[in-house]
């Protein structure tokens, strides 16, 4: 048990740098992209309702966190809700192996999510911008992913996912001017 705990700490440290986060980002993009495509094709009403419930929970906890961005418990809560939303997409594939793999790397994914949320909200604060709902200020939103699944739009899902994951810089989250060269943005 002790060695497992040390292994978890080691893994988090191994991936807690720019290159490591990129590895996690690519794994998430691979799994979440494939599962989103499957969800678009074969999700049930029950699947979609579960995803909507996770979306509503995320939106509520995001709003609570945005009112107190230095509160570590509120950050933890929104990270867990964010993970639950993305895991629900994995579950919509009905592929047990995808679900197991995602859960095996849950701590790494949660660390990636935490980094993105924390960095982006503090970047917005430093720029003097509203800390309101990200869904209201950018197309890189969980709502956009949800709607793309409902509407069967794989391209919209890919665009939103790549911005949420930090693969493509998101206006309103990663940059605030008309254009910033993506090479100048460091997530």
Please annotate each region the language model reported.
Residues 11-16:
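Arg/Lys-rich, alpha-helical DNA-contact motif
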Residues 124-134, 140-147, 158-187:
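C-terminal-biased regions
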Residues 19-25, 132:
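A short glycine-threonine-serine/GTX helix/turn-capping micro-motif
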Residues 24-119, 141-144, 156-170:
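Conserved amphipathic alpha-helical segments that form helical-bundle/coiled-coil interaction surfaces
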Residues 1-10:
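Single conserved hydrophobic/aromatic residue that forms the stacking wall/gate
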């Amino acid at each position: 048990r002790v060695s497992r705990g040390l292994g978890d700490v080691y893994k988090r440290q191994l991936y807690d740098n720019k290159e490591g986060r990129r590895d996690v980002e690519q794994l998430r993009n691979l799994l979440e992209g494939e599962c989103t495509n499957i969800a678009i094709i074969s999700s049930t009403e029950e699947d979609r309702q579960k995803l909507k419930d996770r979306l509503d929970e995320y939106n509520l906890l995001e709003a609570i966190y945005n009112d107190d961005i230095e509160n570590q418990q509120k950050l933890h809560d929104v990270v867990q809700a964010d993970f639950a939303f993305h895991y629900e997409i994995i579950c919509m594939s009905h592929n047990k192996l995808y679900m197991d793999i995602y859960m095996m790397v849950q701590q790494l994914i949660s660390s990636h999510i935490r980094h993105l949320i924390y960095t982006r909200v503090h970047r917005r604060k430093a720029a003097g911008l509203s800390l309101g709902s990200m869904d209201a200020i950018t197309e890189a939103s969980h709502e956009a992913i949800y709607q793309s699944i409902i509407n069967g739009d794989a391209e919209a899902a890919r665009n939103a996912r790549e911005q949420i994951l930090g693969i493509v810089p998101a206006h309103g989250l990663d940059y605030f001017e008309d254009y910033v060269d993506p090479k100048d943005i460091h997530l």
